[in-house]
Curated annotation (Swiss-Prot):
One of its GO terms (biological process) is DNA topological change. The keyword Isomerase applies. This is DNA topoisomerase 3. PANTHER family: DNA TOPOISOMERASE 3-ALPHA, PROKARYOTIC DNA TOPOISOMERASE. It catalyses: ATP-independent breakage of single-stranded DNA, followed by passage and rejoining. Residues 763-828 are annotated as: Disordered. It comes from the Eukaryota. Residues 167-617 form the Topo IA-type catalytic domain. Belongs to the type IA topoisomerase family. It comes from Dictyostelium discoideum (Social amoeba).
């Protein structure tokens, strides 16, 4: 019986290339439910079966995504802290439904499933996503995993002969990391986005955020963010440490204080016997520099007393070097530094070269080739290249081939990045990346370059000076690899004990210079050294902080943080957290690695990590005012609820928190304008009554009357129709001092020991009223009509007074309705 086999690759281009290799380019193509993911059908002998009916298709990266369940998706649905424990589910999103339908249809016709996903942890996770979809459609079928490092016939054939089972531990490790990132990212993103709505985190011609000027450039405004004030200010456990490296360098720049220093140098001219020319030699001071001018000048004068120089040492040594094989991180660093191609673009070009079968898998930490790798065969593939073909031929035909050096890293999954086929017709950055990878591979298989380094040390009056000359003795790998510099620096021959009088001795003043902004190569090195992300994700994290407008590249291709990026990092540092430091993320990555190795379970890692971040969230919530301290340096406050407010009085009443003057503002609503008090120093806003004339309350001596509870200046609200007034504390009105009260809260409801607080007096009046009502009822029962009339009159008068001015603490809701009914000219 003929076996039907469904094969699934990670990308359409990979499916097309692998199908072409297995079918010898004789596959027939048909459409799937997704117009981007076609299917190729052909016959092939595999798994000891002849003429199997093979169908090859693909997904496009992850087939499924995780998210919290529907009830927690609206931002107003819960406190962000609940997202640490909210139920989550992994589902196929709507845009991947066509892929799901194709897999379901094809697996029902298949006996075997072969998973051709990329051979890394992420690919393993995608393999299990494909497997889950297929198992939901069909209960029983065999499944295998194909492992390959390049899309070339030799590797694909080897993969077919060595099919294995997918690695579930690697997949679980990815699921764990994804859940951690989802919970932490969602909680802190909502937390900081919702709170920071109080600031205008946008830039326009009328309102440019404040900037700080470092020693050698301007910090970038967040000017590329064309948001409407509703942008998301995201947090990610990887993106924040990445941002932290950029901001840390920035703070080193802005905090840098230049210092003057002085250094000595000796200039001598001597005949070079080999060239017959006079060569100037500048000997540098072995002390390097002094920051004390007097001390430097004394030593300078000492040297001038007797300028004769004596050669005290001449050392010569050879240095040899050639590069180790290429890893993903080294490719990204070199491309950024030498080719000026960003890390994320580099990986896109490398992926394209890989799917074309031109290079090996571009995501690898390995910098050593396994024994038995046919390196000469790979070099032979390049013999026809017009640029380096002659060099490649010499390597294998003239016995110049040298087995590559071994580095220190091996991920046991993929070999170092190397060319797998000769390429012609490439152009632009794609060609640059291919050329670099190929030249690096040829350099690894070449002889070392040899340099002669000669250092001459002289003495003048006890002060030592030295100079080093360098000469290339053998080009070696440099012949094919122009990306390493050749630093020839000739000096004439000196003999130990030789004496001479220098041409001059100089005392030179210099000034220390601030460090430069961090480059992409330096950022990648910092991330790699601190285990932030993986070789497959580092470029993405760097791109993310650019997409979020936290950083931007300047004209020198260096990363400069925006006001937003600096403010976020500074806020969490004020809280005492190390969110921008690598420690927390490195611990997560280490735990995820342990899941892959079977040393920890998913539940163990989730429990410890989520609990740790939940505690940090609670502490952040308690110290949320740190955002105010950082953000008000760069941003103006936003108008509450997105409205446009105009200032009625710029310095109206006193703030009880900072003791400064608050602004009295109103929005533009002509029918019922909303009025607020706003403190520009504390970034606090207080709602005011919509009706009535509002003025500051002062004592008979003209002194502002402050609330004894919160120290905010009390305001008077007057009804212009009946000329009646009441008083409010703006703070207490919006945040009642006693939780049993609801806002708006007024002085006539307050029971504090204050001459404005009449709540106690009204309580007494209410108690008297209740006692009178009791007496009245008792008298009625006794048919005592003569004494009932005055009680009725007094009760009516007391009740009317009560409804007009107060609501008791014990009956707030009902009495407040009475108050509203009698004071219908006000809306509190």
């Amino acid at each position: 019986m003929t076996k039907r086999i469904l094969n699934v690759a990670e990308k359409p281009s990979a499916a097309k290339e692998i199908a072409a290799i297995l079918s010898n380019k004789r596959a027939t193509v048909r459409e799937g439910f997704s117009k981007y993911n076609k299917l190729w059908d052909f016959k092939y002998n595999i798994l000891n079966f002849n003429d199997c009916e093979m169908t090859f298709t693909s997904v496009t990266g992850h087939l499924m995504e995780i998210d919290v369940v529907e009830q927690f998706k609206p931002w107003a649905s819960c406190d962000p802290i609940q997202l640490f424990d909210a139920p989550i589910r992994k589902t196929v999103p709507s845009d991947k439904e066509p892929l799901k339908k194709t897999l379901e249809r094809e697996i029902k016709k298949a006996d075997i499933l072969i998973l051709w996903l990329d051979c890394d942890r992420e690919g393993e996770n995608i393999a299990f996503e494909v497997l889950e979809v297929c198992k939901n459609a069909k209960k029983k079928f065999e499944f295998y995993r194909a492992h390959f490092s390049a899309i070339i016939p030799r590797e694909i054939d080897r993969a077919c002969k060595n099919l294995a089972k997918p690695n579930e531990k690697d997949s679980i490790a990815v699921d764990t990391r994804m859940e951690i990132d989802l919970r932490i990212g969602a909680a802190f993103t909502r937390f900081q986005t919702l709170y920071l709505k109080k600031f205008k985190i946008i830039s326009n011609s009328d309102n440019q955020p404040k900037t700080t000027t470092p020693a050698n450039g301007n910090i970038l405004n967040n000017s590329n963010n064309n948001s409407s004030g509703k942008e998301i200010i995201s947090y990610g456990p990887c993106q924040f440490p990445t941002l932290g490296f950029v901001v840390e360098r920035y703070f080193r720049i802005v905090n840098f204080k230049p210092e003057d220093f002085w250094h000595l140098s000796v200039v001598h001219e001597k005949m070079d016997t080999s060239s017959g020319k006079m060569i100037p030699v500048t000997f540098s001071w072995c002390r390097n520099r002094l920051f004390d001018y007097t001390a430097a000048f004394i030593l300078y004068e000492k040297c001038l007393d007797n300028t004769e120089a004596t050669v005290v040492d001449v050392t010569s040594k050879e240095s040899r070097y050639r590069p180790v094989p290429l890893t993903t991180i080294e490719l990204q660093k070199a491309a950024s530094k030498k080719l000026r191609i960003s890390s994320v673009q580099t990986m896109q070009y490398a992926e394209e070269l890989y799917t074309k079968g031109l290079i090996s898998y571009p995501r690898t930490e390995t910098d050593s080739f396994q024994a038995g790798t046919d390196l000469k065969g790979l070099i032979g593939n390049q013999a026809s290249n017009p640029e380096w073909g002659a060099y490649a031929s010499r390597l294998i035909n003239n016995n110049q081939f040298v087995y590559p050096k071994s580095g220190k890293n091996n991920d046991n999954s993929h070999p170092p990045i190397h060319p797998t086929s000769s390429a012609t017709g490439l152009s632009g950055n794609l060609k640059k990346i291919y050329d670099f990878i190929t030249r690096r591979f040829l350099a690894c298989c070449s002889e070392e370059s040899v340099f002669a380094n000669t250092t001459v040390t002289i003495d003048i009056q006890g002060e030592r000076f030295s100079e080093t000359g360098t000469m290339v003795l053998k080009l070696g790998y440099l012949e094919v690899y122009p990306f390493d510099k050749r630093n020839d620096k000739l000096i004439p021959t000196y003999q130990k004990g030789e004496r001479f009088t220098p041409k001059r001795i100089d005392l030179t003043k210099g000034t220390t210079v601030a460090p430069h902004y961090i480059t992409e190569a330096e950022l990648l090195t910092a991330m790699d050294n601190n285990k932030i992300g993986t070789d497959a994700t580092m470029a993405t994290h760097i791109q993310t902080i650019q997409d979020r407008f936290y950083v931007k590249k300047n004209e020198s291709n260096q990363f400069v943080p925006s006001n937003l990026g600096v403010s976020l990092v500074a806020s969490y540092e004020l809280m005492g957290f190390e969110f921008s430091k690598p420690n927390l993320r490195a611990a997560i990555e280490a735990d995820v690695d342990k899941i892959s190795r079977g040393q920890k379970t998913k539940q163990e890692v989730l429990l410890s990590t989520i609990e740790k971040y939940k505690q940090l969230y609670q502490l952040a919530n308690q110290n949320i005012n740190c955002f105010d301290r950082s953000f008000r340096e760069y941003y103006e406050p936003a108008d509450p609820k997105g409205g446009e407010f105009r200032v009625l009085v710029s310095q109206f009443s006193r703030c009880g928190k900072c003791n400064g003057k608050m602004q009295y503002k109103s929005d533009q609503n002509p029918e019922a304008p909303k009025r607020i008090l706003f403190c520009p120093q504390c970034i606090d806003t207080f709602d005011l009554p919509k009706n009535g004339d509002i003025s500051q309350l002062v004592t008979s001596m003209g002194v502002p009357q402050n609330c004894p509870i919160c120290q905010y200046q009390v305001l008077s609200v007057r009804n212009p129709i009946n000329d009646k007034s009441y008083t409010i504390c703006p703070k207490c009105r919006n945040s009642p001092p006693d939780p049993i009260h609801k806002k708006p809260f007024h002085c006539f409801q307050c029971t504090f020991n204050c001459n404005l607080a009449t709540g106690n007096k009204q309580q007494q009046q209410q108690q008297q009223q209740q006692q009178q009502q009791t007496n009245y009822n008792r008298n009625n029962n006794n048919n005592n009509t003569n004494s009932a009339r005055p009680i009725t009159t007094r009760t009516t008068r007391t009740t009317t007074q009560h409804r007009t001015f107060t609501a008791s603490n014990n009956n707030f809701n009902n009495n407040n309705r009475n108050s509203d009914r009698n004071n219908n000219n006000f809306i509190f």
